[in-house]
Regions:
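A short-motif feature that recognizes glycine-rich, charge-decorated loops
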Residues: 77-119
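Bacterial N-terminal signal peptides
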Residues: 10-19
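Bacterial N-terminal signal peptides that target proteins for export
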Residues: 1-9
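Short, well-ordered, aromatic-rich surface patches in folded extracellular/luminal domains
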Residues: 24-52, 119-177
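A short, structured loop/turn motif at beta-sheet edges
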Residues: 64-65, 99-106, 141-146
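Well-ordered beta-strand positions in beta-sheet-rich domains
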Residues: 59, 96-98, 149
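Glycine-rich catalytic cores of cysteine/serine-nucleophile enzymes that process amide/ester linkages
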Residues: 52-92
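Residue-level detector of buried hydrophobic side-chain packing
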Residues: 62, 109, 137-139
Length: 177
């Protein structure tokens, strides 16, 4: 009887951890992925030049379908669709453009940003260049089910990535008609 009990106990102790670990995997994800073409991919970049008053803002949103939405102006609506200051003098200063590019071109932009570390949370915050700047650029992204949404100034956190983001903004800032 004792032998059966010990066998049962050993088996139970062996099986006990499985319900706790089922579905678990490593808590880290490789931030340098290959972006697969998908309509669910998107990147939103917000750039402010604070050296001028009123602050000049540009927002560029790129979707996996190839749709690019560009907003520019001095209104808070450029970077915040839910802005509240409707009585502000700059409230109506916003222009919105919708551009359609090839989905593969959008995917190439996504892959370039991933290669520069847009999804790498370990990379941000470790920059030795902590210059305070009058420019602000932030990015939010969902690429192949990997997200990044920290609202930090990339010019201060990761200057190399900030320059890549600024290149994307410049690419769509002045759409040709």
């Amino acid at each position: 009887m004792r032998e059966k009990f010990l066998t049962f106990l050993a088996f139970s102790l062996f099986i006990l951890p499985f319900p706790f670990f089922s579905g678990c995997g490593p808590f880290w994800v490789d931030p340098y992925i290959t972006v697969k073409e998908s309509s669910l991919n998107w990147v939103a970049i917000h750039y402010y030049n604070m050296s001028r008053q009123p602050i000049r803002r540009i927002g560029v949103e790129i979707y996996g379908t190839g749709t690019v939405l560009v907003k520019k102006g001095t209104s808070e609506l450029v970077s915040n669709d839910f802005a509240k200051r409707s009585k502000d003098a700059n409230w109506g200063n916003i222009k919105t453009y919708r551009i359609q590019i090839d989905p593969q071109a959008a995917n190439d932009i996504f892959q370039n940003l991933v290669n520069y570390g847009v999804l790498d949370r370990e990379k941000t915050g470790k920059s030795s260049k902590k210059e305070v700047t009058d420019r602000f650029i932030a990015v939010k992204a969902n690429l192949s089910n990997n997200t990044y949404s920290d609202n930090v100034n990339m010019f201060e956190e990761d200057p190399d990535l900030a320059e890549q983001l600024l290149d994307v903004v410049r690419e769509f800032e002045h759409p040709s008609r």
